Amino acid sequence: MQFSKMHGLGNDFMVVDVVTQNVYLSPTKIRFLANRHSGVGFDQLLFVEPPYDPEIDFHYRIFNADGSEVTQCGNGARCLAHFVRMKKLTNKREIYISTQTSRMVLTIIENNMVRVNMGVPKFELPQIPFDMHQIEKKEILYLAKNYIFGGIVSIGNPHCIMIVNNVDSAQVSIIGPILEIHKYFSERTNVGFMQVINREQVLLRVYERGVGETQACGSGACAAVAIGIRLGLLAEQVQVALPGGKLVIYWRGPGQSLYMTGPAVHIYDGFIND
């Protein structure tokens, strides 16, 4: 099995071409490969598959380091765009992909920068999914004392955003796993901790479900900005600084698609003899 190791702002991936290769990896095998001591080491495994729709160029599957399959990864989408061009699976600069829950348009700009149309953020509780009505704010604030509950949103995957005064001292490793598996999130959730610097700049740390805290989370950056704009705290275009680097997020508001721009980096190619 041939693969590429890639990263987007330090959020690292093992990317596999399943268009020209026949590949199946069990959850146990994925966990083994994800191990940074005995395997390849990665936050997520990405499968690039043939499309299921004539209007789509590729189907995109994402597996977390714990072997669970998830429905969205913004940093991974940028790496996918770089990967399919690099491997000559397409010569397009605008690439249409599908996931289990959404469709995205990836536009390769220059110098390995990629702009991703992440679709329209969803705030309706059943679409997140979030199985509670009316009292979610009180319950979440009880779990995450000394934080301001920003909101919950789906960017193709669920996110809970907390607003903090100082992102460096945020208890990401404590609050993150508590909220990730909270009973009201039927599919678990990603948890973002956002510090607002001004209307055009935020600092963000993200605890990703099935992974833990990562250097960057593209969909998490999108979720944080969408929540911030909805609360009237942020402008339409915002620079999000994560531990691994910066993303630019643009959203005009309800009913509009949200856009993320950032880098995609190829590290090396490898081969695993099964």
Curated annotation (Swiss-Prot):
<feature type="site" description="Could be important to modulate the pK values of the two catalytic cysteine residues">
    <location>
        <position position="208"/>
    </location>
</feature>
<feature type="active site" description="Proton acceptor">
    <location>
        <position position="217"/>
    </location>
</feature>
<dbReference type="Pfam" id="PF01678">
    <property type="entry name" value="DAP_epimerase"/>
</dbReference>
<keyword id="KW-0028">Amino-acid biosynthesis</keyword>
<feature type="active site" description="Proton donor">
    <location>
        <position position="73"/>
    </location>
</feature>
<feature type="site" description="Important for dimerization">
    <location>
        <position position="268"/>
    </location>
</feature>
<dbReference type="GO" id="GO:0009089">
    <property type="term" value="P:lysine biosynthetic process via diaminopimelate"/>
</dbReference>
<keyword id="KW-0963">Cytoplasm</keyword>
<feature type="binding site">
    <location>
        <position position="44"/>
    </location>
    <ligand>
        <name>substrate</name>
    </ligand>
</feature>
<comment type="subunit">
    <text>Homodimer.</text>
</comment>
<feature type="binding site">
    <location>
        <begin position="208"/>
        <end position="209"/>
    </location>
    <ligand>
        <name>substrate</name>
    </ligand>
</feature>
<feature type="binding site">
    <location>
        <position position="190"/>
    </location>
    <ligand>
        <name>substrate</name>
    </ligand>
</feature>
<comment type="function">
    <text>Catalyzes the stereoinversion of LL-2,6-diaminopimelate (L,L-DAP) to meso-diaminopimelate (meso-DAP), a precursor of L-lysine and an essential component of the bacterial peptidoglycan.</text>
</comment>
<keyword id="KW-0413">Isomerase</keyword>
<protein>
    <recommendedName>
        <fullName>Diaminopimelate epimerase</fullName>
        <ecNumber>5.1.1.7</ecNumber>
    </recommendedName>
</protein>
<feature type="binding site">
    <location>
        <position position="11"/>
    </location>
    <ligand>
        <name>substrate</name>
    </ligand>
</feature>
<feature type="site" description="Could be important to modulate the pK values of the two catalytic cysteine residues">
    <location>
        <position position="159"/>
    </location>
</feature>
<dbReference type="InterPro" id="IPR001653">
    <property type="entry name" value="DAP_epimerase_DapF"/>
</dbReference>
<keyword id="KW-0457">Lysine biosynthesis</keyword>
<dbReference type="GO" id="GO:0005829">
    <property type="term" value="C:cytosol"/>
</dbReference>
<feature type="binding site">
    <location>
        <begin position="218"/>
        <end position="219"/>
    </location>
    <ligand>
        <name>substrate</name>
    </ligand>
</feature>
<dbReference type="InterPro" id="IPR018510">
    <property type="entry name" value="DAP_epimerase_AS"/>
</dbReference>
<feature type="binding site">
    <location>
        <position position="157"/>
    </location>
    <ligand>
        <name>substrate</name>
    </ligand>
</feature>
<comment type="similarity">
    <text>Belongs to the diaminopimelate epimerase family.</text>
</comment>
<feature type="binding site">
    <location>
        <begin position="74"/>
        <end position="75"/>
    </location>
    <ligand>
        <name>substrate</name>
    </ligand>
</feature>
<feature type="binding site">
    <location>
        <position position="64"/>
    </location>
    <ligand>
        <name>substrate</name>
    </ligand>
</feature>
<comment type="pathway">
    <text>Amino-acid biosynthesis; L-lysine biosynthesis via DAP pathway; DL-2,6-diaminopimelate from LL-2,6-diaminopimelate: step 1/1.</text>
</comment>
<dbReference type="GO" id="GO:0008837">
    <property type="term" value="F:diaminopimelate epimerase activity"/>
</dbReference>
